[in-house]
Amino acid sequence: HEGFKQFTGWQSQASTADARNLTKLLVGPWSHTNIGSDEPFGNVSFGSEAAIDHIDEQIKWYDARLRGIDTGIDDEPPIRIFVMGENSWKTAHSWPLPETVYTNYYLHDHGILSEHVPGNESPDLYGYDPVNPVPSHGGQYVSIECSGPFDRTDVEARDDVLVYSTEPLERDIEITGPILLKLYASSSTKDTDFTGTLVDVYPDGKAIILTEGILRARFRSSIEKEEFLVPGTVYEFDLDLWET
């Protein structure tokens, strides 16, 4: 997430033309400690295509920048990302990808997620016990060994987790880009945390986390100003689920 922000920030706001035009972004299906590997990450194996020589990539960049050697790296698009599921590499010149089709999905009662705008439906309720919070299982907010695409069926089975699912997909859908969860919710207390995850449900029932986000309610507008909730009042919360 921060890597995407740094890259787009350098492209648009860096003070020199070299910093704006020569920055590279490489995103693969790895953790902090197995960069370039084709070993399974979490509960998923991405195949041999995931393997690259990342040291060689860095040497090419440094040789070009520091030694003036034509390594061919300047002829390559600045962005190179790995598309999970398809398990192939894609290149681009800007982020988000220019061909991105932004699509809204809506939460419905009975655990339904669809592209149809909901009508007058009853709210979904759950009880939150801070003594027994929902655990992290995979994703990006846990330690290196426990991060990544893990199966979260055990987490989704909890009574304090709401799950919304689409119908089984009839065709492949590539989800590449920033994800935002716009949540309308109220609480019985003046402050709480909301979390959201985007999950890929496999035909065998595994629920593999793709990305996630968390928001403390009192900082919903700004981390610099506390705005406590009025219990029972519905608020709009924007949860940044990062990029996938």
Regions found by a protein language model. Name each.
Residues 1-2, 54:
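Phosphate/oxyanion-binding active-site loops and adjacent basic polyanion-contact surfaces
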Residues 40-244:
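C-terminal, loop-rich substrate-recognition/catalytic regions characterized by aromatic stacking residues
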Residues 2-23:
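Active-site-adjacent alpha-helix of alpha/beta-hydrolase-fold enzymes
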Residues 1, 23-25, 105, 183:
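Catalytic His-Asp charge-relay segment
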Residues 19-48:
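Catalytic cores of eukaryotic secretory-pathway lumenal/extracellular enzymes that build
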